[in-house]
Amino acid sequence: METTEGKNDLRAKLAEKIQTFRSQRKATEKVDRALLLQRRKEKAKARAEAKKLAKKESKAKQESKVAAYDTGNSSDNIADEENDNHKSTITYGTLIVGDDKFSNGKLKVAGKKRGPTDVFGALKHLEAKKRRIESMDEEKRRKIEESDKWHRVLLQAEGKKLKDNEQLLKKSIRRKEKEKKKSSDAWKERKDNEKKAMLMRQQRREENLKKRRESKKSKKGKAPKKKKPSKKK
């Protein structure tokens, strides 16, 4: 039988294990909370930097307009700038950041923007954007690339999936086409099997009908002949 001292030792060891487990669980919870707070700080910092960048771009745009006006070519320069911005669908005083929009340094909540939801549409959109950017001058390309960079940073911070990698999109399309072909082949094979099964059923039916007809003919041929009545003398 166990002594009282032995039981006390077991209880002490069990209590120690429980305490260790609780300490480890609390430490894990602290790490998870610290990680969550760190992510929130990074997201807030990225938003603040994006807002700061939008203010700088807005200020540079205003200074550019003033300089153009001072040279006496304000109307033509502003008109050209607005036309270029309209064609390239880029407004330098506006920066899209995740689901938010910074316009002239002020945060505006952006409505849901409809865009390509499938990889085929995403690839076409990316290729068209690439061609459009390549046709622009170096300054416009730089501004668009800077805006896109912040956009990617914030989307990644929010854990959203990016669809701006041309190679990955093409790889995804090849995989989908392969799956589509596999599905098409399976559908064709199923239809062929159904057709073969139908032909086999039809063939068995015709064979059964033929056997029945032959059986009826055979029975008629074996039927006994009726005896003629004998003549009375």
UniProtKB/Swiss-Prot annotation:
The modification Phosphoserine is found at residue 75. Residues 47-64, 133-149, 180-209 have a biased composition (Basic and acidic residues). One of its GO terms (molecular function) is DNA binding. InterPro entries: Rrp14/SURF6_C (IPR029190), SURF6 (IPR007019). Its main location: nucleus. Residues 210-233 have a biased composition (Basic residues). Keywords: Coiled coil, Nucleus, Phosphoprotein, Ribosome biogenesis, rRNA processing. Residues 47-87, 130-149, 164-233 are annotated as: Disordered. Residues 32-65, 122-223 form a coiled coil. GO terms for cellular component: nucleolus. It is found in: Nucleus, Nucleolus. One of its GO terms (biological process) is rRNA processing. Component of the 90S and 60S pre-ribosomal particles. Belongs to the SURF6 family. Involved in ribosome biogenesis and cell polarity. Required for the synthesis of both 40S and 60S ribosomal subunits and may also play some direct role in correct positioning of the mitotic spindle during mitosis. This is Ribosomal RNA-processing protein 14-C. The lineage of its organism: Eukaryota, Fungi, Dikarya, Ascomycota, Taphrinomycotina. The gene is rrp14c.
